[in-house]
From Swiss-Prot:
It comes from Shewanella woodyi (strain ATCC 51908 / MS32). Residues 167-195 are annotated as: Disordered. InterPro entries: DUF480, WH-like_DNA-bd_sf, WH_DNA-bd_sf. This is UPF0502 protein Swoo_2055. Residues 177-191 have a biased composition (Basic and acidic residues). Belongs to the UPF0502 family. The lineage of its organism: Bacteria, Pseudomonadati, Pseudomonadota, Gammaproteobacteria, Alteromonadales.
Length: 219
């Protein structure tokens, strides 16, 4: 799809506000610019001017991804997306997929855990499995809409990145390597720690019992 950085931010904001503030959607140029420049829930944080926002909107309208409307009795033009889940959209997403695409457009590459923790206002994921299944479905589309990045040093989990914007993308690795291996590894380590803790407790109890028995003999 090759959206520019500004275009991707605008689409992400329109997706977000459609769900989180439906009473204020569609958005005026001013409201959309403010949404693009939010300090929270944005990475990177931007400082787009209204002129830059309008230029990106115009480009998106030519791509038929955004449409404008003027309410009855109002001179203010407002904008809404046609990016997905409309009768004019090629892309149709489940609520889970919608939330993930929105978050990836607004906040860049993220781990499944980060996506789950940040998605509350968009979609309530039951668990990490639901996140991973939705990511896999998006990756298996033709063309793919997300991909998995190699695990970074110091990180327990791999991050996922959208493939909708034209920003430089990281190296991709097969998603099949992700879910089970990375979720089971911590679980295995936790099981080992629990077993070790139990053994230490048992040894402490045995030592205490031996000390008491020895003390009885000495007495």
């Amino acid at each position: 799809m090759n959206l520019s950085l500004h275009e991707a931010r605008i689409i992400g904001c329109l997706l977000e506000k459609e769900v989180t503030t439906p009473d204020q959607y569609p958005l005026s140029l001013n409201s959309l610019t403010l949404a693009c420049n939010q300090k929270s829930s944005r990475d990177p944080v931007m400082s787009m001017t209204e002129s830059e926002t309008q230029s990106a909107i115009d480009s998106l309208m030519k791509k038929r991804l955004v449409t404008d409307q003027t309410g009855f009795g109002s001179r203010v033009t407002k904008y809404k997306h046609r990016f997905c889940n409309t009768e004019f959209s090629d892309l149709q997403f489940s609520p889970a997929q919608f939330a993930l695409i929105c978050l990836l457009l607004l906040r860049g590459p993220q781990t499944p855990g980060e996506l789950k923790s940040r998605s509350g206002r968009l979609h309530q994921f039951a668990d990490l499995n639901e996140v991973e299944n939705a990511l896999l479905a998006l990756a298996q589309r033709e063309p793919s809409l997300v991909h998995q990045l190699p695990k970074e040093p110091g990180r327990r989990d791999s991050r996922f990145e959208e493939l909708i914007s034209d920003q430089v993308k990281g190296e991709s690795v097969p998603i099949s390597e992700h879910s089970r291996s990375q979720r089971e590894a911590p679980s295995k380590r936790q099981d080992e720690m629990d077993e070790l803790t139990l053994r230490v407790s048992q040894l402490e109890l045995e030592v205490k019992t031996l000390k008491e028995a020895l003390q009885d003999l000495l007495d």
